[in-house]
Amino acid sequence: MSAPRKTRLYAILAVVCGAVLTIALMLYALSSNIDLFYTPSEILYGKNETQEKPAIGQRLRVGGMVMPGSVRRDSQSLEVRFTVYDAKGSVDVTYNGMLPDLFREGQGVVAQGILDTDDHIAAKEVLARHDENYTPPEIKAAMEGQNGHAPAAGPEGKRL
């Protein structure tokens, strides 16, 4: 092999090795920031046909409904304990902080945190979900007419 071909081969190999190393480092950095989404039943019984359960200590997000009657607040701190459920199971969540305004029993919620035990999540963040018809209380009050009713229809049946 001639000297120019050898130099070109080494340059190509160096570029390929550099690209592989860069991709490997990027994937390693991203893997620590990935939080997989689970439902309570997937945490308890596994995901899909593989029945793969999240590992204890894994960062994840759990989404479901807040079980009515399950919210317990600590009077000495901001700690809140509640249960998130779906059709097939429920998991307990502990969160230390201010809950969102939309957080209510029977309402949808997504908790992001770490799986402590098989059925308990220590949440770092709690997001309240709502449907597309949500109206903030202040706007709803401003839009409603007297006695809590919407304004009457105007000309041609249009709402005022």
Curated annotation (Swiss-Prot):
<keyword id="KW-0201">Cytochrome c-type biogenesis</keyword>
<feature type="topological domain" description="Cytoplasmic">
    <location>
        <begin position="1"/>
        <end position="8"/>
    </location>
</feature>
<protein>
    <recommendedName>
        <fullName>Cytochrome c-type biogenesis protein CcmE</fullName>
    </recommendedName>
</protein>
<keyword id="KW-0997">Cell inner membrane</keyword>
<feature type="binding site" description="axial binding residue">
    <location>
        <position position="134"/>
    </location>
    <ligand>
        <name>heme</name>
    </ligand>
</feature>
<dbReference type="GO" id="GO:0017004">
    <property type="term" value="P:cytochrome complex assembly"/>
</dbReference>
<keyword id="KW-0479">Metal-binding</keyword>
<keyword id="KW-0472">Membrane</keyword>
<dbReference type="GO" id="GO:0005886">
    <property type="term" value="C:plasma membrane"/>
</dbReference>
<dbReference type="GO" id="GO:0046872">
    <property type="term" value="F:metal ion binding"/>
</dbReference>
<feature type="transmembrane region" description="Helical; Signal-anchor for type II membrane protein">
    <location>
        <begin position="9"/>
        <end position="29"/>
    </location>
</feature>
<feature type="binding site" description="covalent">
    <location>
        <position position="130"/>
    </location>
    <ligand>
        <name>heme</name>
    </ligand>
</feature>
<keyword id="KW-0349">Heme</keyword>
<comment type="similarity">
    <text>Belongs to the CcmE/CycJ family.</text>
</comment>
<dbReference type="GO" id="GO:0020037">
    <property type="term" value="F:heme binding"/>
</dbReference>
<keyword id="KW-1003">Cell membrane</keyword>
<dbReference type="InterPro" id="IPR004329">
    <property type="entry name" value="CcmE"/>
</dbReference>
<keyword id="KW-0735">Signal-anchor</keyword>
<dbReference type="InterPro" id="IPR036127">
    <property type="entry name" value="CcmE-like_sf"/>
</dbReference>
<keyword id="KW-0408">Iron</keyword>
<feature type="topological domain" description="Periplasmic">
    <location>
        <begin position="30"/>
        <end position="160"/>
    </location>
</feature>
<keyword id="KW-0812">Transmembrane</keyword>
<dbReference type="Pfam" id="PF03100">
    <property type="entry name" value="CcmE"/>
</dbReference>
<dbReference type="InterPro" id="IPR012340">
    <property type="entry name" value="NA-bd_OB-fold"/>
</dbReference>
<keyword id="KW-1133">Transmembrane helix</keyword>
<comment type="function">
    <text>Heme chaperone required for the biogenesis of c-type cytochromes. Transiently binds heme delivered by CcmC and transfers the heme to apo-cytochromes in a process facilitated by CcmF and CcmH.</text>
</comment>
